[in-house]
Amino acid sequence: MPSDNTFVRVRQQQRDPLHVNSPVSGGNISGVQGSGSRSGSTVPPSPPTPTTQPSVNHYDVQVDRLNNLTLEELLDSPDIKGYNRSMQVYNWDRSINKRVRVEFEAKLKSRMSNQVSRWKGNWKEKGDEAKPKWIDPDVWKGLVQFWQDPKSEKKSNNSRNARYHDLDGKDIYKHRSGQTSYKARARKRCEKTGETTPDFLELLDETHRKADGTFIDGKSKEIYKQVTSRIEEEESHMCSMDNPESTGSGGLSVHSKNKIFTEKLAAAEACIQSQAERINSFDILFDYLAEKDPALAAILRHGSSTQIGQANPNEPPVSAAPEPQVANEETAAAALANLATGSSPPSTVF
């Protein structure tokens, strides 16, 4: 009759089947058989020992298979298709978390570029039907309220005018910052260099200068020259040991440089705003003159088209001598235009 040790051994084998063919189990069996022979009892022969098969780690095979898939293949795999796709929730093995994040961020950057602008355009055409399915209704409601706000619409129009209009003849104002705001770029620069305050002039150089060293627009080039000239002027009149604004190397501190940059930038923005206001005043005056004197408005309009037509400076102006009455009207129009723009009257009649 089997002893209690045999029962314990069988239970242990059921719990841990990997140790069936272990040397310890074999020793126990032989020990039991030996004791049965000595006691005179007959012990049934043990079943043939199965051949030990090499263990296969299916976990590693699964990980290798997933690592060889692209993001699209991973999301379209049969394992993922079994989940509820309407919930937009995906699962993957923890061992590929880093790769999934890299793939996700790359896809996000390509898909989300100008995405909000496209949403707004679709909303203007289709209304709330343009809402993407995955956007929270409260978030979409907030976007619609922002798009309908007159202040945000005015800000959008001003930004569009600033991008596509050349008010001072120095080319359209551009930048190379992309979708990254200047504030975020300044924060990243501080994290990279360890500075507490970023150098605004270096940020301007980073976001407005091409790889060949040239600026992308004339306005940025002018501001950069004015700021650097002012900094050199201040540094040439200071002593590094006596002036607290200087650094140990004899130059201005970052705070002082940023102060100069802010002053020059504020002056440039004020100049642009003043030009915009003058242009607006001229438009109002022109509308008033067009209503009161259509003939004078036609003369002004003809003069503007003539100036635009003479785009080539090498071509001599071809115009007939104006009659005295027409000349007087043109002189009056020029005086009114100078009054609106705040400039001095020209010496010759246009």
Swiss-Prot record:
Q: Which InterPro entries match?
A: Probable_transposase_24 (IPR004252)
Q: Where is the composition biased (Low complexity)?
A: 30-43
Q: Where is this region: Disordered?
A: 1-57, 307-328
One Pfam assignment: Transposase_24
Annotated family: Belongs to the transposase 24 family.
Kindly provide the name given to this protein in its UniProt entry.
Probable transposase-like protein At4g04430
Species source reads Arabidopsis thaliana
Top-level taxonomy: Eukaryota, Viridiplantae, Streptophyta, Embryophyta, Tracheophyta
